Amino acid sequence: MLTKRIIACLDVKDGRVVKGMQFKNHEDMGDVIELAKFYSQNGIDELVFYDITASAKNERINRAWVSKVAQNISIPFCVAGGIKSEDDAKELLANGADKISINSPALNDPDLISRLAKSFGVQCVVVGIDTFKDENNELLVYKYTGDENKSHHSGKKTLEWVKQVCELGAGEIVLNMMNQDGMRKGYDLDQLTKVRQICPVPLVASGGAGAKEHFLDAFKLGVDGALAASVFHKKLIDIKELKLFLKDQGIQIRI
């Protein structure tokens, strides 16, 4: 059995880490380098950095902070936001990122997934999916969620898009469940179950973690990683305590 991963998510805006609720009303959480160092030293298995404005504003990720993060931490990290080409990905990987993640650019150009997988290997290519459950319990994929004024339904349904990106060469999927984001009431287990059944690649749950038990629930469903932000940024959950709790519950985790 593969070791499960605890992942901290850092939404980056103008070199600062921010956190919103349901992808809105972001508040400042601190300096990106200092937070990255804190997590690297305190037991997080992996970091994901989302430049939340890059795709929406059609900008490139600032390479300076990516390089600085790589110099200051000793754990794997993934970078996302505005990656629209092989050259964009190559530059970020050259600056020290272990993986790159694409979201809205993949919706605009699905073949980008295949090109990146071919150029850099599937292990480097993560697809982020921002999924929203509407009033009819329909699971819909949203795009440009980094800007609440531009965020809208992409026209795709979540389960169909999951199947498509896996076929195109995604090495991992991060499922960002928008309804739960920042609410700290637990991951959407029903949605995770549906996605796990059709997703043959590593799956990371994102959106809703508020207690140690929420991570346990997700891992019991078979996800490979559980991602959280506000509970870690605000130190509401101690990472080492979380890992010991999970180990005691029979989850294979790196202590």
Curated annotation (Swiss-Prot):
Keywords: Amino-acid biosynthesis, Cytoplasm, Histidine biosynthesis, Lyase
EC numbers for this chain: 4.3.2.10
Active site: 11, 130
InterPro entries found in the cross-reference section: Aldolase_TIM (IPR013785), His_biosynth (IPR006062), HisF (IPR004651), IGPS_HisA/HisF (IPR050064), RibuloseP-bd_barrel (IPR011060)
GO aspect biological process, one term: L-histidine biosynthetic process
Annotated GO CC locations: cytoplasm
One of the record's GO molecular function terms: lyase activity
CDD domains referenced in this protein's UniProt entry, alphabetically: HisF
Enzyme class, spelled out: lyase
Catalytic reaction equation(s): 5-[(5-phospho-1-deoxy-D-ribulos-1-ylimino)methylamino]-1-(5-phospho-beta-D-ribosyl)imidazole-4-carboxamide + L-glutamine = D-erythro-1-(imidazol-4-yl)glycerol 3-phosphate + 5-amino-1-(5-phospho-beta-D-ribosyl)imidazole-4-carboxamide + L-glutamate + H(+)
Location of the protein in the cell: Cytoplasm
Pfam family, one: His_biosynth
Xref: SUPFAM superfamilies: Ribulose-phoshate binding barrel
Family under the similarity heading: Belongs to the HisA/HisF family.
Function in brief: IGPS catalyzes the conversion of PRFAR and glutamine to IGP, AICAR and glutamate. The HisF subunit catalyzes the cyclization activity that produces IGP and AICAR from PRFAR using the ammonia provided by the HisH subunit.
NCBIfam families reported in the protein's UniProt record: hisF
Subunit structure of this chain's protein: Heterodimer of HisH and HisF.
Protein name: Imidazole glycerol phosphate synthase subunit HisF
Organism: Campylobacter lari (strain RM2100 / D67 / ATCC BAA-1060)
